[in-house]
């Protein structure tokens, strides 16, 4: 079965990465069905030579099941030397070949962690920051404000983060 994503075509805001855009926040409403269009994830990813890292949070086509996904690619040999492993209820990356691991700081992290009824999905080590601060009763937004772009000049990779709440068979994100 092909996985589809729903993109909000009128509200998507692309903010260039980098130090000059610190503090810019984008909040999207949960109920924007009128502004959304269904697109094929496979088609979207295959239309670019380097999709990089990405997260998907949403629901199946019939709206009955929650969907959370994370994907990565790597430009450097160090970035390509990683695999996903289960870690409790979450996922983390680890070196495929530890002898080839150079700098683990931007490639070894937990992109998915579960805190109670919340599944946190991100493209970097901010997953741990969000998890730890939410565990101390801070909000998702408060946790995000403690972090900035990745220190990988000249790219300054944006930190992408999402959260899904599941409660009594219902879910929102």
Give short role names for the model-derived ranges.
Residues 1-35:
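N-terminal amphipathic/basic-hydrophobic helices that include classical n-h-c signal peptides
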